[in-house]
Amino acid sequence: MDKNRIEGAAKQVKGSVKEAIGRVTGDKSTELEGAAEKNIGKVQRKAGELADDVRDATKSTR
């Protein structure tokens, strides 16, 4: 499993928590930071999934 997949998933969770805290406390800045971090994590996780798919495809063609 690609490390970007794991790190991205962790960023998604952290961002979701931060976003929720911002929403509950009424801190729009924290909410937006959390949403941004969540989306960055989603992109990083997808990049890791793609790397895994490419790795698996190259293994199966050998």
UniProtKB/Swiss-Prot annotation:
Region (Disordered): 32-62
InterPro entries reported in the protein's UniProt record: CsbD, UPF0337_stress_rsp, YjbJ_sf
Coiled-coil regions, chain positions: none
Gene3D superfamilies named in the record: YjbJ
One Pfam family per UniProt: CsbD
Family statement drawn from the similarity comment of this UniProt entry: Belongs to the UPF0337 (CsbD) family.
Protein name listed in UniProt: UPF0337 protein XCC0070
